[in-house]
Amino acid sequence: MPKLEAKKGLFQFYPHNLIWLGLSILAIIIDQWTKWIASTHLNYADPVPVLPFLNWTLLHNYGAAFSFLSDAGGWQHYLFTGLAGIVSIIFIFWLMRMPKNAMILPAAIALILGGALGNLIDRMTLGYVVDFIHIYYQNHHFPAFNIADSAITIGTILLLIDTFFLEKQRIQRAEVKHD
């Protein structure tokens, strides 16, 4: 079996980062599996109560998050597909270049990547994204979403935590090491 080795340069690759690609793949698998269950067991736009604040409601989202641009006439399909593809490629390169001791940032990138690819699969194969999780409180309804959207949201929160709280610590440690 060939041994995986780190490569230098633009395409440098660290084998320890395969675990983060595994997290992305896990997010995609769970997302696609739950969307398949929703699509095969739910009737379109017919809410199934789960908890007093949660319904399973199968919906088709032709736009972006929260149905943004869903009624824009079709061009948004190409825009969102292209953006998701480009961002995914960038995130794969970024993810594979993470240092061994990094945890929060690669987890964030892996979740965002998995969520983006999960929704991209829908958009490319179905022409829309399957949403089915519907949260509400009394008459206040949050737009339906899916596991991919949840992975993107959790990844974004982790990215913000890393950026605003952990980056300063990394800079301080680097300055101490340098002195």
From Swiss-Prot:
Predominant localisation class: membrane
GO cellular component: plasma membrane
Annotated active site: 131, 149
Pfam families per UniProt: Peptidase_A8
Reactions catalysed according to its record: Release of signal peptides from bacterial membrane prolipoproteins. Hydrolyzes -Xaa-Yaa-Zaa-|-(S,diacylglyceryl)Cys-, in which Xaa is hydrophobic (preferably Leu), and Yaa (Ala or Ser) and Zaa (Gly or Ala) have small, neutral side chains
Keyword Iron: no
A molecular function GO annotation: aspartic-type endopeptidase activity
Pathway membership: Protein modification; lipoprotein biosynthesis (signal peptide cleavage)
Any GO BP annotation: proteolysis
Described purpose of this protein according to its UniProt entry: This protein specifically catalyzes the removal of signal peptides from prolipoproteins.
Family as reported in the entry's similarity comment: Belongs to the peptidase A8 family.
Protein name per the record: Lipoprotein signal peptidase
Gene behind the chain: lspA
